Amino acid sequence: MQLQELHMLVVLAEELNMRKAAERLFVSQPALSQRLQTIEKAWGTKIFLRSQKGLTVTPAGEKIIQFANDVTLEQERIRENIDELEGEIHGTLKLAVASIIGQHWLPKVLKTYVEKYPNAKISLITGWSSEMLKSLYEDQVHIGIIRGNPEWKGRKDYLMTDHLYLVDTEISCIEDIAHTERPFIQFKSDSTYFQEIQHWWHQKFKTSPKQTILVDQIETCKQMALHGIGYAILPSVTLQNEDKVNKMPLLDMKGHPIGRDTWLLGYEPAFELKQVQAFVQVIKDMLDQENPF
């Protein structure tokens, strides 16, 4: 089998959907289906079962896909070793980044990185910090940028802290929250963030909010607060250049600002790769030059 065919099987196994896999591979669905049939014929067995719900990997397919994964990873490793011998920054930088950081801070970091190292490639996934940590544990990525205080036995570099604010278009004093009928707009988040907010709230008010609205995305939560629908608690990274809303810092019982730390994590061998070293240096230089939030 050619490496291109192995990569195709890896993508199909990840998506389990012909349309999505075809989009990722930049081919048409009929062409992808025909190539899959050719591969299955060469192996003499079905790799996937097709249904209206998508694809299901067969027992034989599991072994073939594991082989495809192993060969693909080995190919990447050899390419990285060759790139290191040539002394230039090549290879793929694999990142797993918390969504908030990926949306509001990472783009300018990556812009600098790709301008300095145009031959390097980037593979990026974003999501809740707990999901990104799982990708790191499973060795799917080189580097994780995680919020909170994750348990990690490898290298763990502190990057920054952004403080939490209660934002509202009408209320300008946190104590007034106890008397308002306005809804508390919340967004779905990982458990550690939710627990921090719950802990602060019950220490401060000793009772539950009178009304709540729960939305899927932090940006939806922010826009609803900015448009006066209710109040929200948001990290400062999402509030840059937002001057038309009241922003009240959350303080703990000792009067200290409450914030969320952001960390750069990875296994030690990953930091030996030149593309990873270059990325870490870009971040360090950027943090030395400016306050991120």
UniProtKB/Swiss-Prot annotation:
Q: Which CDD domains match?
A: PBP2_LTTR_substrate
For this UniProt record, the keywords arranged alphabetically read as follows: DNA-binding, Transcription, Transcription regulation
Please name the GO terms of the biological process aspect recorded for this protein, alphabetically. Answer: regulation of DNA-templated transcription
Record domain HTH lysR-type: where = 1-58
SUPFAM superfamilies under this entry? Periplasmic binding protein-like II (SSF53850), Winged helix' DNA-binding domain (SSF46785)
Molecular function (GO) terms for this protein are: DNA-binding transcription factor activity; transcription cis-regulatory region binding
Offer one Pfam family short name for this entry: LysR_substrate
Q: Which residues bind DNA?
A: 18-37
Protein name as it appears in the record: Uncharacterized HTH-type transcriptional regulator YkuM
Species in which this protein is naturally found: Bacillus subtilis (strain 168)
Question: Gene name, please?
Answer: ykuM
